[in-house]
Amino acid sequence: MRVAVDVMGGDNAPHVEVEGAVAAAREFGVPVTLVGDAEKVRAELARYDCKGLDIEVWHASEVVGMHDSASDAVRKKKDSSIRIAFELVKGGEAVAVVSAGNSGATMAAGMFVLKRMKGIDRAAIAQLFPTVSGKTLVLDVGGNVDCKPIHLVQFAVMGEVYARFVMGVDNPKVGLLSNGEEASKGNELTRETSALLREKPINYIGYVEGRDIFNGSVDVVVCDGFVGNVALKLSEGLAEAVGKMLKAEIKSSFLSQIGYLLSRKAFNNFKKTVDYAEYGGAPLLGINGVGMICHGGSNPKAIKNAIRFAHEYALKGVNGRMAEKLNESFPGDAREREGAPAPDAGTERVAS
């Protein structure tokens, strides 16, 4: 089961992607196909000892830039590395795609080439957040800035399956992000969504607040892509700021430096917990295949872990489990009764 890696999309492509892919092949035994400018890719590969590693190179003559329109990039740049990577999955040459490129283009390419799963109107980008007791899955974190209640319900069902079969959580708790836990809080979108969620075969616990993402009280947090992207960028900025504050305090006095030396292991464990590279990337849920969207500034460690997670996702057959849960949650014409638009209606607006 090969993983196709878009090696031309990230801020430091193709160096970071190739190094991460080589590490994934060496440490985890994952077969990888590097998609991009073959000459540049092979030049990067020559820097490593790849003997015995299952690594292939697939040429793609075009690159989707970070400022390219997602829809135009997919339709006009037919030989781009990101589109070719998804075409490999469609053709059975790979089981998953990993990309640190334009997130909107990655999402658009996944939906354009592999199409949405039956029963899904909008694909969603999910992200694991560290908590005091483990991890919380938040979706959507940028795929759809405008959502209808039915979209959030679909996100909840997909998130529940991901938590159960990827995170290993038995009967995961699903919450809807709001400005308070009381039923009277929220807006029209959250109130309508909450009513629908109570009818679904999932462990829906009601409204949750932003702080609940990190306190371990909920396993899956559902929101629209606008709110989710703000939460994601806020957490990234906070983690970076806290790190800088700690460094400044440690350097402020001799006693602080002694204290740091005595607590170095604890500091290193904390740093590892909040390091996005440990999580690799954000899975794109709702397409007929596996897609992993990485941060544009990902380092080799992040790419390596994204490849591992994408490979494990495919091995566990999560999409098949998701299809079963969707059929259970939306039997017959339930989607029409709940006001779902036709699957291809509307255009997703992506937060970067």
Swiss-Prot record:
Its main location: cytoplasm. It holds the Pfam family FA_synthesis. It is found in: Cytoplasm. It is an enzyme of class 2 (transferase). Residues 328-352 are annotated as: Disordered. One of its GO terms (biological process) is fatty acid biosynthetic process. Pathway: Lipid metabolism; phospholipid metabolism. It comes from the Bacteria. One of its GO terms (molecular function) is phosphate:acyl-[acyl carrier protein] acyltransferase activity. Belongs to the PlsX family. This is Phosphate acyltransferase. It comes from Citrifermentans bemidjiense (strain ATCC BAA-1014 / DSM 16622 / JCM 12645 / Bem) (Geobacter bemidjiensis).
